């Protein structure tokens, strides 16, 4: 008796069940309920996403659209029923075994509504959807998505404001603008300029000059427009009408015209005062107290009507009692920076800079917070000088600058300012950085995890493979972790006592060698990159049954490698017939490096001793391939080899050009012949 075959997927039992599922009666009430629930789900999902639209229209759903939605729901239910049928068929039954391939295809089920149901009235329930930019929820409840969105907005807004200040600072260095302001100052205040030029330019003379400029600029500049103002997060229901027109310049010419006319916003007035000081060859900075939207989901940074300018005010923006822009002047005699504000505070500040920090409930109501202060130099660089104007320990500053990243010691603002920082720093910059860093308190680690990557303290267990302690390093304290019998104590060292160590091979690539008699700072397991080195290590491990160790040395244990000078025009070579030339100092005295491709055959042709210059290695397929760049030849023969190389290159280029010219002529000849043939065919057979 032949064995019974398993029931196929197209069995009658499975097919009948599918048919019953797909032929559910299309009850209008059921359809109405289904559409409404799907609409509600869509509303909930859309309300979580920010929308760029200021108004929302109610969704208009046609009859066909809702029927299609219902059919899709039925098909999904059918597919889920199909999965359960397949599971039942795998179990097998005597009833299904009687049917095998009688039905090779499924019955086509019509999912469209039948005629009887079309005659019934279908009621479509719609609901007004109001998308929001920010979720209106109870205080203290915020999702991870809201926090992520606000953090992205904070980073983007901070970057845009920083770039805005950089553009304005670049405009303030325009020579036409500086000449115009200087001429205006000489015309209106000749005595102030003359007194400064004729003085010895001491600290008192500088203060006298700044006070004179401040008073004249404050009286002469007319505030006619609004400056920067942080409005906070708004919902779409609140709209996009901010209630006032801010000052906008489309190009530098509009900016220059407004500044020379002494009319504009208080931000423009503060920027113009910086340019005025620069026109007198003073080392002046443009200071910008950035006011980005915060990354916190708390309600204190949401929009409120109190943020807008007061309509009853007699002067524009006088409700903002603290400046956004001001000026710093470097005092050469005192070696320090002086802060000057000629618009809002209208004063000169030499020591106490906290006058610029917004304080009190009124400043909070206007969303004025000092968290990021940027200083733009004459040379178009920028740096963070926040610590000069505010207390790093204040809770207000921590709320603004404490951005959480995977690395809790990563300073996002420092990384961004690093892109605008000066590369070649002078003594003044170094002294200022040390002064500002001295105001940053060191956060004391309290747990085992706090010691990892801590900028001040370190545990021995947290040292990397290439890090080691100096021999004279001493523990500054002892940290205890755990409680009771599980408590352990470890010695804590200073991070400055940790040095970076390297192998002798790595130092050789830098042109340095280990000093005689130096002992390694650390012994670590040797690494093998190439196949030959791996085999060597495996052979040594098999012989000694111990891992291969390698010594690491710090930079103070090395000295510059000085190769022996060449003698009698003979270039010394290594075992591979070339010479290591990783840095310029590795070229021996009496030799010259000619880093030109193909120059080796010229030296060989002239019968001059040479060696290929190895300048690096490429690692491919577990093999170290040396990279050669030119040759090393005796110094007295270098000029002759170079001139012969130029002559050969000239001949080679001429031959290459002749070859290319011949190819081009051949292509033109082929094209002209084709055109002649085409013309003859058209004349004969057209």
Swiss-Prot record:
GO terms for cellular component: cytoplasm; nucleolus; nucleotide-excision repair factor 2 complex; XPC complex. Residues 82-93 have a biased composition (Basic and acidic residues). Residues 1-101 are annotated as: Disordered. Residues 68-81 have a biased composition (Polar residues). The keyword Nucleus applies. Pfam families: BHD_1 (PF10403), BHD_2 (PF10404), BHD_3 (PF10405), Rad4 (PF03835). Signal peptide: none annotated. It is found in: Nucleus. One of its GO terms (molecular function) is damaged DNA binding. Keywords: DNA damage, DNA repair, DNA-binding, Nucleus. Residues 1-20 have a biased composition (Basic residues). GO terms for biological process: mismatch repair; nucleotide-excision repair. Coiled coil: none annotated. Residues 48-61 have a biased composition (Low complexity). Belongs to the XPC family. NCBIfam families: rad4. This is DNA repair protein rhp42. It comes from Schizosaccharomyces pombe (strain 972 / ATCC 24843) (Fission yeast). The gene is rhp42.
């Amino acid at each position: 008796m032949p064995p019974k075959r398993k029931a196929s997927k197209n069995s009658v039992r499975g097919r009948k069940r599918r048919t019953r599922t797909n032929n559910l009666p299309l009850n209008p009430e059921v359809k109405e309920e289904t559409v409404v629930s799907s609409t509600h789900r869509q509303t909930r999902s859309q309300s979580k996403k920010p929308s760029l639209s200021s108004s929302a229209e109610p969704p208009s759903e046609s009859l066909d659209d809702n029927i299609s939605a219902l059919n899709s729901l039925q098909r999904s239910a059918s597919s889920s029923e199909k999965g359960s049928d397949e599971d039942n068929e795998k179990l097998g039954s005597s009833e299904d075994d009687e049917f095998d391939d009688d039905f090779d295809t499924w019955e086509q089920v019509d999912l469209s509504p039948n005629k009887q149901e079309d005659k019934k009235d279908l009621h479509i329930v719609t609901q007004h959807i109001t998308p929001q930019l920010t979720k209106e929820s109870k205080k203290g409840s915020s999702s991870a998505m809201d926090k992520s969105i606000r953090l992205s907005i904070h980073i983007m807004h901070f970057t845009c404001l920083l770039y805005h200040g950089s553009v304005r600072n670049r405009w303030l260095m325009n020579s036409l603008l500086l000449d115009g302001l200087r001429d205006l100052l000489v015309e209106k205040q000749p005595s102030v300029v003359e007194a400064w030029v004729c003085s010895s330019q001491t600290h008192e003379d500088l203060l006298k000059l700044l006070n004179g400029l401040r008073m004249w600029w404050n009286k002469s500049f007319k505030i006619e427009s609004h400056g920067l103002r942080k409005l906070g997060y708004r919902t779409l229901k609140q709209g996009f009408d901010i209630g006032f027109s801010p000052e906008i310049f489309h190009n530098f010419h509009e900016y220059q015209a407004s500044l020379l006319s002494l009319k504009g916003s208080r931000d423009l007035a503060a920027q113009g005062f910086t340019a005025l000081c620069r026109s007198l060859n003073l080392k002046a900075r443009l200071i910008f107290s950035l006011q980005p939207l915060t990354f916190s989901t708390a309600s204190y940074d949401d929009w409120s009507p109190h943020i807008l300018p007061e309509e009853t005010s007699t002067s524009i923006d006088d409700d903002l009692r603290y400046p956004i822009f001001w000026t710093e002047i470097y005092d050469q005699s005192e070696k320090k920076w002086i802060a000057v504000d000629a618009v809002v505070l209208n004063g000169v500040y030499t020591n106490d800079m906290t006058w610029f920090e917004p304080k009190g409930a009124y400043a909070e109501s206007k969303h004025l917070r000092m968290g990021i202060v940027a200083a733009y130099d004459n040379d178009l660089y920028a740096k963070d000088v926040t610590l000069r104007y505010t207390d790093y320990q204040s809770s207000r500053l921590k709320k603004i600058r404490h951005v959480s990243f995977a690395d809790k010691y990563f300073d996002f603002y420092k990384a961004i300012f690093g892109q605008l920082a000066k590369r070649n720093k002078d003594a003044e910059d170094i002294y200022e950085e040390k002064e500002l860093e001295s105001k940053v308190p060191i956060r004391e680690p309290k747990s085992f995890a706090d010691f990892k990557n801590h900028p001040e303290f370190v545990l021995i267990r947290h040292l990397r493979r290439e890090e080691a302690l100096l021999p004279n390093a001493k523990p500054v304290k002892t940290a205890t972790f755990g409680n009771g019998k599980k408590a352990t104590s470890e010695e804590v060292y200073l991070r400055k006592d940790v040095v970076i160590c390297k192998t002798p091979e790595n130092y050789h690539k830098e042109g340095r060698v280990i000093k005689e008699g130096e002992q390694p700072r650390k012994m670590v397991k040797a690494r093998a990159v190439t196949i030959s080195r791996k085999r060597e290590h495996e052979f040594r491990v098999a012989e000694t049954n111990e891992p291969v160790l390698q010594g690491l040395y710090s930079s103070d244990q090395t000295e510059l490698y000085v190769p022996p000078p060449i003698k009698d025009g003979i270039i010394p070579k290594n075992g591979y017939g070339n010479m290591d030339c990783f840095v310029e100092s590795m070229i021996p005295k009496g030799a010259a490096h000619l880093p030109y491709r193909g120059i080796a055959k010229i030296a060989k042709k002239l019968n001059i001793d040479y060696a290929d210059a190895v300048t690096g290695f490429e690692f491919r397929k577990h093999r170290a391939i040396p990279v050669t760049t030119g040759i090393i030849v005796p110094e007295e023969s270098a000029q002759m080899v170079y001139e012969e190389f130029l002559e050969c290159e000239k001949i080679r280029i001429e031959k290459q050009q002749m070859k290319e010219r011949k190819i081009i002529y051949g292509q033109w000849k082929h094209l002209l012949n084709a055109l002649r043939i085409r013309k003859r065919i058209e004349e004969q057979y057209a």
